[in-house]
Amino acid sequence: MAAATAPKTMPSSVFAAALLLLAAAACQASPYYPLELGYYRYTCPQAEAIVKASMEKAIAQNPGNGAAVIRMLFHDCFVEGCDASVLLDPTPFSPTPEKLAAPNNPSLRGFELIDAIKDALEAACPGVVSCADIIAFAARDASCFLSQGKVSFDMPSGRLDGTFSNASESVKFLVPPTSNLSDLASSFAVKGMSLEDLVVLSGAHTVGRSHCSSFVSDRLDVPSDINPALAAFLRTRCPPNTTTSDDPTVMQDVVTPNAMDIQYYKNVLSHTVLFTSDAALLTSPETAKLVLDNAKIPGWWEDKFEKAMVKMASLEVKTGHQGQVRKNCRAINHY
């Protein structure tokens, strides 16, 4: 019998290079960790298609449905992370959840739409798809439909639903539309979001409606930079003193009200935006340049918006034992 030969050793330089390649491959394989693309490919392969079909129908009926779920994603993710806590109804043990907070009530919409999508998913794959992922998928699809496909991106999933919701947290993390740039930037920085993310995500104000109470006091009742013609128009639509029973809504973008496009940035430049928080983007050289770039460079905003949406939808997600998959998006499971 021939003597066994000793195995050849790998040169240290080759071994080190191999480790680097493995590390690079690992990073490339899971850029959205702890989320992943195609999370439901085995457990509910039709999940994303069900959400997409539901959103297509809802937006065809009313484009405002798309704007509502895009806003809902922001209001969910900035408070306790992307965990569908904004969907929870009040209970005797939690009488003031996020949805009753001033930033959400009565302006946040889309709850019934999410309920309908959840019902469809429960019929297809009971107990599998989280409400948090439904919001994320719905916002992704709304962006695509409202932009006529110009905003199109993959949304990683695997979020779990939270079990805590308190209105005070919404007030803490969702700054009002009367905010200046410093307050806006601080609210984004706390969440690890950049000044560019702030400017890019503000572009979602190109769709949807706003209650008059969100801008009358600081844009119409006092001197502001708002375009005089727009101010005159708004005064025909908004009472000088809004109340809970007299608080009409107006389009945020009167030029292309139902299109996800760069018109918002053109409106900022022409001082035809509703909110102080929108006008504030022109109060620093850095953000003013970003506004101009988004308004002028073809495809620039769409690309940045796609990346910022995924980044926002990955904030403080709950996985593993941190959450649950709710059976009803409005209530936590009781086992």
Curated annotation (Swiss-Prot):
EC numbers on record: 1.11.1.7
Pfam families (alphabetical): peroxidase
Keyword set includes Heme: yes
Cofactor: heme b; Ca(2+)
Assigned GO CC terms: extracellular region; plant-type cell wall
Induction behaviour: Induced by wounding and ethylene treatments.
Annotated glycan sites: 166, 180, 241
Recorded catalytic activity of this chain's protein: 2 a phenolic donor + H2O2 = 2 a phenolic radical donor + 2 H2O
Record GO biological process: circadian regulation of gene expression; hydrogen peroxide catabolic process; regulation of circadian rhythm; response to oxidative stress; response to stress
Root EC class: oxidoreductase
Tissue: Expressed in the elongating region of young roots, and in root vascular tissues and epidermis.
Protein name: Peroxidase 2
Underlying gene: PER2
